[in-house]
């Protein structure tokens, strides 16, 4: 997908999937735990921002993001460092009731918070196999995620502009 959509651009794409690890660290006490284990405090890190930091001397990138609807962070590091970072978070997090949960629990929290994921909670019209599965952000009440005032082109822009002008065929309610 990246290569297909990079046609005509001067970009180089490198596969790093096996080299990078990410830990989703979510919940009301995550800031307190991070402030105890990081070299620099995370108090001033704004939503959707990132910072370089260290946990137990290991370089990490911390983003103030998450898909649970609660206070949350994502911690990015080299894959080889993931287990020691996990162990440190669990060690200090135990004082705050931090416990690991699976992806299904996180998905439920995400959906309850109204944070939907493309091709997980709904299938875009370009990928749906059957007509009833096709949906757009406007139909799902996610129009706030569409920045039509943003300059430049993005995939699906023309179709979304048309739908915004003419209205959606249906709308999800509830």
How does the language model describe each region?
Residues 1-174:
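Conserved, structured C-terminal
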